[in-house]
Amino acid sequence: MNTRVIISSVLFFLSFPPFNFWYLIFPSLFFFYSGILLSSKPFLSGLVFGAISFGVILFGIQSIGYEAWIPLSLLMGLLYGFYGKLFKFIAVKTNNNFFILIGIISTFDLLRAYFPFGGFPWGSTSTVLISGYRDTSFNLLPSIFKTFGPTGYSLIIQSLTLLIVLFVLENKKKYTYLKDSLVFFILIFTPLSLFLLNDSFNLLDKNNKSEQISVVIVQGNSPCPGAKNRCNNERARIYESHINLTKSISSEKDLIIWPESSTGFNNDPLIHDRVLTDIQIEVERLNSYFLIGGDRPIREANFENYGLFINNEGTIV
């Protein structure tokens, strides 16, 4: 029972960065759903899967402290434990009705996107294929992303895998699942076909013209990474890292993105003119718009996140 789930959890985290074996997401889901459906203890199976897979994926936050990583890993395990229990219960009650089980999958994905602590949307199954498809010549994958979005794409991946699992496990209902698969493919390819036709022939909007823009994401660094590490002028040095990397950009770009905490405190463009002036110089040189993340203190022990958009004239919009 747990062997399938353990294999599934290992394949799952291997499909995510930094390992990037994106194609392992498919056998991972196969072993997960088959493991849950065959398990006599679906809660335990879900718990094992969630704790192992997300424990590895989230391991980076141990730089904050193990008191952050361990509870969150256990919480994800409990979340998948309840999911496994509910999934098996509904499967038994509905005699493995494919479309009802899809409803359970989509409801859980929606819950996980917002809970706990604001959700974990980049842990979706489709996330691994955002970069994975670039390693293939299968150009349909970007179109699926554009048509259904990452959440819808995740549901498609999981639903197709579940359909294969049910087809393998349920010998007496193969004809039923063949009919279900036909309906499911019609539901998928109807909007996808419309999207591809419009993308190719511009059927729905004659005035719509696609235009590429050049975007640069500037990822600076801290001289002392980790929440427990401290060094002198850390925030100033983080800002300097971003501005210096931006100065190394040699050609004009449409949009420059600085991530969260790249500015703030004593380096806030809204408060400190020298910081805004530094950025305006780069705006003029690169003829770029800037999207900048930062944080500022609001009380002695608290801070708030902010985002700034600076147009190509150097004005904060």
Which residue ranges define each predicted feature?
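Membrane-embedded alpha-helical bundles of multi-pass enzymes
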Residues: 1-202
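Soluble catalytic regions of membrane-associated enzymes that act on cell-envelope
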Residues: 197-317
